[in-house]
Amino acid sequence: MGSIAILGVPGAESGGGTLKVYNWGEYIDEDVITQFEDETGISVVYDVFETNEEMYPVVEAGGVKYDVVCPSDYMIQRMIDNNMLAELDYDNIPNAKQIGDDYWNMSKDFDPKNQYAVPYCWGTVGILYNKQMLEQLGVPKPTSWANLWDPKLSDEILMQNSIRDAFMIALKQKGYSLNTSNPEELAEARDMLIQQKPLVQAYVIDQVRDKMINGEAAEGVIYSGEMLYIQEQIEELGLDYDLEYVVPEEGTTLWIDCWVVPKNAENKEAAEKWINFLCRPDIAKKNFDYITYSTPNTGAYELSDEELQNNEALFPDMDSPAMKNSEILRYLGDDTDNIYNEMWKEVKAQ
């Protein structure tokens, strides 16, 4: 668990009590927390986590009773299934109307009646490629995940060190659902990942961005929200190559992180004020500028400049074939999780 930061204003507690927030690291502009405290008189206790898997048992155990938490799609589904979340009162969250219909519909995949979760950030997984390096290697611009099996890319590929992301790539290439629990389809995907392994320079997470900026690889699997930072760095450093992002035609993982209120929250009223505050367009825009992951907030989108609005990595055409073929990650249950884990070990052991 991340260290607790109590960001309060003197005497604030008497105004509205304390709000315990559990969020991803680097996933909010800290000025927003201060502004919330100043405007509401509520004192914020703010903890951070690194993965959904780290967050879940902490909330489940209830040692710290968090009032508001920001999990991802599949983990929200798991929390709903296990009766861990409180239904939201949207009368207290009028700014929820700023969230676009596309994102409410995406959320229905794991929260069918939109009762428990308010979208915060979203994005895709795709291929980041160095245009000039691909030309030198004689590799075409990627339009399919199959590109990551091109023998000319030996030692030039950075893969995500993430079980579901890695399997998604192999499964989608074969035309299977990224949420399959079919052992035969999973075995096929495992074998493909083993076959690809000699081409892979490294399995990494956060390092894809910096390695690609440094020209250390020709292609990398990356999250769409990294593109704004990458484009700024290319300009700032005056690099003489282009890094471009594409979602392959077979589709990809659509992910969405949302705010939820655990059932054992001690200050649900403050939690709903927090969610409402973060849905305010000026605040959502401030967070978007800081986090750089796509915002589902239509008001914040309208406040953004035209260049950002037209950035296809951040705001893709939802009617394109690639996006229509994309899926939200689902929680598949412990048994299927174990199959994925065992098969991933087999890939890494080769």
Where are these regions (language model features)?
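Early extracytoplasmic/lumenal segment of secretory-pathway proteins
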Residues: 6, 11-79
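Hinge/lid segment of periplasmic solute-binding proteins
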Residues: 56-57, 77-122, 137-146
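Short beta-strand->loop
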Residues: 86-97, 117, 237-253, 262-265
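A bilobed periplasmic-binding-protein/Venus flytrap-type ligand-binding module shared by bacterial periplasmic
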Residues: 128-133, 172-175, 255-267, 286-287
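Short loop->beta-strand "edge-of-pocket" segments that line small-molecule binding or catalytic clefts
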Residues: 146-161
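Ligand-binding pocket segment of bilobal, Venus flytrap-like solute-binding proteins
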Residues: 158-162, 166, 170, 177-246
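Conserved C-terminal helix/tail region of periplasmic/extracytoplasmic solute-binding proteins
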Residues: 210, 320-350
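Mature extracytoplasmic/periplasmic domains
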Residues: 262-323
